[in-house]
Amino acid sequence: MQVLPPGSTGGPSRLFILRPVATTLLMAAILLAGIIGYRFLPVAALPEVDYPTIQVVTLYPGASPDVMTSAVTAPLERQFGQMSGLKQMSSQSSGGASVVTLQFQLTLPLDVAEQEVQAAINAATNLLPSDLPNPPIYSKVNPADPPIMTLAVTSNAMPMTQVEDMVETRVAQKISQVSGVGLVTLAGGQRPAVRVKLNAQAVAALGLTSETIRTAITGANVNSAKGSLDGPERAVTLSANDQMQSADEYRKLIIAYQNGAPVRLGDVATVEQGAENSWLGAWANQAPAIVMNVQRQPGANIIATADSIRQMLPQLTESLPKSVKVTVLSDRTTNIRASVRDTQFELMLAIALVVMIIYLFLRNIPATIIPGVAVPLSLIGTFAVMVFLDFSINNLTLMALTIATGFVVDDAIVVIENISRYIEKGEKPLAAALKGAGEIGFTIISLTFSLIAVLIPLLFMGDIVGRLFREFAVTLAVAILISAVVSLTLTPMMCARMLSQQSLRKQNRFSRACERMFDRVIASYGRGLAKVLNHPWLTLSVAFATLLLSIMLWIVIPKGFFPVQDNGIIQGTLQAPQSSSYASMAQRQRQVAERILQDPAVQSLTTFVGVDGANPTLNSARLQINLKPLDARDDRVQQVISRLQTAVATIPGVALYLQPTQDLTIDTQVSRTQYQFTLQATTLDALSHWVPKLQNALQSLPQLSEVSSDWQDRGLAAWVNVDRDSASRLGISMADVDNALYNAFGQRLISTIYTQANQYRVVLEHNTASTPGLAALETIRLTSRDGGTVPLSAIARIEQRFAPLSINHLDQFPVTTFSFNVPEGYSLGDAVQAILDTEKTLALPADITTQFQGSTLAFQAALGSTVWLIVAAVVAMYIVLGVLYESFIHPITILSTLPTAGVGALLALIIAGSELDIIAIIGIILLIGIVKKNAIMMIDFALAAEREQGMSPRDAIFQACLLRFRPILMTTLAALLGALPLMLSTGVGAELRRPLGIAMVGGLLVSQVLTLFTTPVIYLLFDRLSLYVKSRFPRHKEEA
């Protein structure tokens, strides 16, 4: 047994140094827990930060936007507006469709929100139109969130109506049942139906009207209870042939008698099997298709949901005929997995680089093995805590672990370097371990808790940004804590067992060359430091200039919100003149699709035309462009978008808006471009007055591009102006007029065909092929009081007017949304400021309000809290350091190093052409924690030298700087190389990781150079200040 010298207690490490078996088993337990935890961690793109969002869709075919607003949307909004926890309510009412999107507070569970929405719908039921084909349908889904998976179903042998029927009953319902799926939509609108197209001339010739025919059809097709017979011995169920199932049966239906002869429906109408809505269509790579979009519930695990769908797809497709082909066009999890894989590779690369730096400095394999064990052990142990906290393996947590490689090795390096110093002086390894670990224990604790203090403000950030970075901050803090434990337990124990004077003194040619190089560097640093200490005011001027420069750079640097990612999917909106019909839009989309599919970066394309819950008007079309994998194309998504827009620009009458899909979705509606700004008024008239003025002003701003609005008030409308007196004299009511028009032109759903598996509709309309346009109104006839028929023209005048194609509300008031992008050379901060300046110039009245939406609103909130976040981090670190040092002065000395980190980070971002977004801001906050460790290591040793060796402050800080130069350089390079893979990242998701790496590498490079000279000067300045205060106020004693 080795005899320990007096005072070699080892501090908190003593027990672990003297009990190597127990220490090894404890570390093995941490390792095992981490490995098991990793297997249970889900994989995601980002932490789950979705707002609880519910979409309520009501379809009322044939209703105008004005009718949808007043009869459907408004009653629902009044009930929804009374719900507690509602953050925002937006609605869009267009021809035949009402979509209300409800976004709740982050703290409200989605299931609770669902219950409140259902109760509100029930309360509004009595106020809704009685002839709604279906009640309002709600889905736990954010409409702005892109589908997690898109499938195209095509067939060369079967009509799309049959294909959709099979897909809906055999595939879509099964996928809807998968845990995590919020909504499955079938774009294409080819739901089977029996279509009855009335021949207006034949109907009029027989003295009939569309209303009498509708009544006849409705009465001829019923499916209701008929009762049963219960005799003394047997019970008999009653049934009848009260249902008609096919177009042929409807064609033979007798609707009236003329002179004793039956008039069948086929005599006055074309009856055929068709689609429920003939103004809907979808195409996959220009082929007619049923496009199935699968959206997840807010908060659901996207990887697990997609995996479940993939597993059941083979079984589901086997139930379809061989002529029906199901193709997965896009799967967002493919890019998510690739991004996570790239980040994992960068994590492993960072570990390798850090270990290489350790070997370069220590030049000793046993000494390198020790931190080489400590780093992965600390990182793997973190997984166990992540499982307990319900975290996931995502880009942010992996970024935290990558950055942590530079942090966690610091503690091990400091311990090893200190113990090695005593062994080289001739101490026995065990004694050196006890003495070195005991001496450095307080420093390790100071480094750990001061670094965690920097992360504390991140945990208290509000709203979605706080939720987003909570996993990042906690993961990093846990890794740092485990690292401190490992460095105070396993590291000194391994040093006592693996290091010796022989191993440390054993050198080869490379080691000797490195040693001579480090000796020359330290000697040069010593000479430079001596000169700096002899000219303190010059150094202080440099430090003060650094502070001013950091403030100036903060002001001028372009500011953004969240990096734009290349996920390989582009969402698009195709816009045409407001009077465009379905047929013209279908033709335009074919032209656009042909141009898009010619691009070498495009892998597949889906397009959709028509009005449904997602597409508001007939003059717009939705597109989803799926790009080839990143390694299979030459350009990033923004270059592809520019190329596609240039290719389509020559097609007359269309405007194409494209934006890349993002993992972080804050918006509540699908927008044409990336950013939104709303203009709201109390009336539509006030809104119509200010929309063109503001739009013209915004379009003139160089900081904005592709400015557009969803305000569409130039749609063509036929106004039927009924002479109520004439109508009353003939016994015709307004309800008769509405019914006649609805029967003719509303694709009215008049009856339901019930089968064992599904329900199908009977659609009534006029055959307008021979009388297109307004001339079709002249064929409308109504039944008068005496039983005769009267043409509509006898009681009404037809006027052509302009009318809105859609009416949008935000929190129950009319609103229009301006969408815009930011051109190259400008930042989101520039665009936001330009819009605010324009708003002031226009001098909007008090009843007109404006507001940024989605990511732009989040950017404003984040920008406003950024300075306070950094101040809070500095204050938290000052409090922790003040408690640890029992001093008001020394924490200020340590914190004086922070401006150097800010200057380096901001300069690096500007040189790299990167914006100061929230990812880069997190990097700057982390730099606050990293850079101050240099000062801590210097000041700890200087105070110890003053206290234990009686040195003067100047000699103490000079010696501390030289003694700690090597570990400072080592730990800084380790942190720098830990961030370097992020800065040089080029794979999937690199846009997210690169700003963090740039900020940290730049900050570390500049701060490493400056703090080695400014810290000792500021230390001596505050020491003299402390002596001055004590001399002036002798009763005031401050322990420094």
UniProtKB/Swiss-Prot annotation:
Keywords from the UniProt entry: Cell inner membrane, Cell membrane, Membrane, Transmembrane, Transmembrane helix, Transport
GO cellular component annotations of the record: plasma membrane
Cellular localisation: Cell inner membrane
GO molecular function, one term: xenobiotic transmembrane transporter activity
Pfam families, A to Z: ACR_tran
Transmembrane spans: 25-45, 347-367, 369-389, 396-416, 440-460, 472-492, 537-557, 863-883, 888-908, 910-930, 968-988, 998-1018
InterPro entries reported for this sequence: AcrB_DN_DC_subdom, Acrflvin-R, Multidrug-R_MdtB
Mode of membrane association: Multi-pass membrane protein
Keyword Membrane: yes
Family: Belongs to the resistance-nodulation-cell division (RND) (TC 2.A.6) family. MdtB subfamily.
Entry-linked NCBIfam families: PRK10503.1, RND_permease_2
Quaternary structure and interacting proteins, as annotated: Part of a tripartite efflux system composed of MdtA, MdtB and MdtC. MdtB forms a heteromultimer with MdtC.
Protein name in UniProt: Multidrug resistance protein MdtB
Organism: Salmonella newport (strain SL254)
Lineage summary: Bacteria, Pseudomonadati, Pseudomonadota, Gammaproteobacteria, Enterobacterales
